């Protein structure tokens, strides 16, 4: 009895929660505007690439 009620509840929850489907719909950012995506990716990857160089520069200038 408890198992049946849990099964009914979970199937009704799944049925009521519908998300958009398709490529790029499960990402936490929009991929619709390619220029916005390009700017975000350049900032993200560029900052990760530049950080070690900036840290080394800071350490060299500190001494």
Swiss-Prot record:
CDD domains registered for this protein in UniProt? Cyt_c_Oxidase_VIIc
Could you tell me which residue ranges are on the Mitochondrial matrix side of the membrane? 17-33
Q: Which GO terms describe its cellular component?
A: mitochondrial inner membrane; mitochondrial membrane; mitochondrion; respiratory chain complex IV
* Residue ranges that the UniProt entry lists as topological domain Mitochondrial intermembrane: 61-63
Q: Which residues cross the membrane?
A: 34-60
Q: Where in the cell is it found?
A: Mitochondrion inner membrane
Keyword Mitochondrion found:
yes
**What keywords sit in the KW lines?**
Acetylation, Membrane, Mitochondrion, Mitochondrion inner membrane, Transit peptide, Transmembrane, Transmembrane helix
Which is an annotated Pfam family here?
A: COX7C
First and last residues of the transit peptide:
1-16
Q: How does it sit in the membrane?
A: Single-pass membrane protein
Q: Which residues carry this modification: N6-acetyllysine?
A: 25
Q: Name one GO biological process term.
A: generation of precursor metabolites and energy
| Protein's UniProt keywords contain Transit peptide | yes
- In the record, which positions carry N6-succinyllysine? 25
Q: In which pathway does it act?
A: Energy metabolism; oxidative phosphorylation
Q: How does it assemble?
A: Component of the cytochrome c oxidase (complex IV, CIV), a multisubunit enzyme composed of 14 subunits. The complex is composed of a catalytic core of 3 subunits MT-CO1, MT-CO2 and MT-CO3, encoded in the mitochondrial DNA, and 11 supernumerary subunits COX4I1 (or COX4I2), COX5A, COX5B, COX6A1 (or COX6A2), COX6B1 (or COX6B2), COX6C, COX7A2 (or COX7A1), COX7B, COX7C, COX8A and NDUFA4, which are encoded in the nuclear genome.
Function, in words: Component of the cytochrome c oxidase, the last enzyme in the mitochondrial electron transport chain which drives oxidative phosphorylation. The respiratory chain contains 3 multisubunit complexes succinate dehydrogenase (complex II, CII), ubiquinol-cytochrome c oxidoreductase (cytochrome b-c1 complex, complex III, CIII) and cytochrome c oxidase (complex IV, CIV), that cooperate to transfer electrons derived from NADH and succinate to molecular oxygen, creating an electrochemical gradient over the inner membrane that drives transmembrane transport and the ATP synthase.
UniProt similarity note? Belongs to the cytochrome c oxidase VIIc family.
**What's the protein here called?**
Cytochrome c oxidase subunit 7C, mitochondrial
